[in-house]
């Protein structure tokens, strides 16, 4: 498992956030940070020489065979090279910078996508709870990709509609739900295994009473949940939008007991994402 020191991360993050630097410098910083993320993805030690466009990364990307990952690397490599060559006389535009930042977030998202290809999303409630501490923009990227490959996974759908709400708007979330009404109405709000556990725990009579009061299908559940959560956000504002705003919650409630490999691996990814970030204190 790759371990990195927080100091370089802090320097990179806050050089970007301060904003009093050119787009060229920002892209150079993002390229450097992206190389750190790639070391994490491919478990390349700091002592081993590596660049985004180098043969080491090209070989590793081929082995992964994931277009989401390779597309992000292509963007970072292309813009990074263009803006570090001295013969380029024009400054990168804000749109170009946005493309590079988006690709950087794709790399962070891939860490989780790769994890959930190994451990199916929704199989562990503790992992799901900690996953929700990630900023909504990053969750949206991850869940969008996972949904395309597992469209009947009710845990993905449940988290996805809330990520759309928190990253975009109530209208966007409701539109997404309505566009998939027919398919969502065919999905139960719980798996067969969960229903069987409920019956074993509470008995058939109490379980049936519980089942009768829950939403009839995923369309109804998602629609109601978006309406209710949107109302809470209107009253209280969002809990967090960035890593910095979420870090206090992550530190206090986001570290899983390392009792199995699934938790050890997830802790490693979460710690990597929050490494070097300052806490913006909020009340939870």
Predicted region positions:
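Amphipathic alpha-helical interface elements
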Residues: 1-78, 85-284
């Amino acid at each position: 498992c790759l371990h990195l020191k927080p100091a370089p991360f802090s320097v990179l993050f806050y050089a970007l956030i301060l904003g009093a630097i050119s787009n060229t410098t920002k892209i150079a910083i993002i390229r450097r940070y992206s190389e750190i993320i790639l070391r994490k993805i491919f478990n390349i030690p700091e002592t081993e020489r590596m660049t985004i466009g180098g043969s080491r990364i090209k070989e590793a990307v081929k082995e992964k065979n994931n277009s989401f990952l390779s597309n992000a690397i292509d963007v970072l490599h292309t813009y990074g090279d263009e803006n570090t060559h001295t013969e380029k006389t024009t400054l990168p535009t804000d749109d170009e910078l946005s493309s590079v930042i988006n690709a950087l977030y794709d790399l962070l998202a891939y860490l989780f996508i790769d994890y959930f290809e190994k451990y199916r999303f929704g199989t562990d409630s503790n992992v799901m709870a900690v996953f929700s501490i990630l900023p909504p923009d990053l969750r949206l990227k991850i869940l969008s990709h996972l949904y395309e490959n597992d469209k009947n996974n009710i845990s993905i759908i449940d988290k996805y509609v809330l990520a759309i709400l928190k990253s975009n708007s109530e209208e966007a979330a409701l539109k997404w739900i309505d566009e998939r009404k027919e398919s969502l109405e065919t999905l139960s709000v719980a798996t067969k295994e969960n229903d069987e556990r409920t019956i074993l725990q509470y008995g058939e009579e109490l379980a049936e009473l519980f089942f009768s009061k829950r939403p009839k299908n995923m369309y109804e559940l998602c629609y109601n949940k978006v309406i209710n959560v949107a109302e809470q956000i209107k009253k209280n504002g969002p809990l967090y939008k960035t890593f910095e705003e979420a870090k206090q919650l992550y530190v206090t409630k986001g570290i899983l007991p390392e009792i199995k490999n699934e938790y050890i691996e997830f802790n490693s990814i979460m710690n990597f994402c929050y490494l070097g970030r300052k806490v913006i204190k909020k009340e939870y």
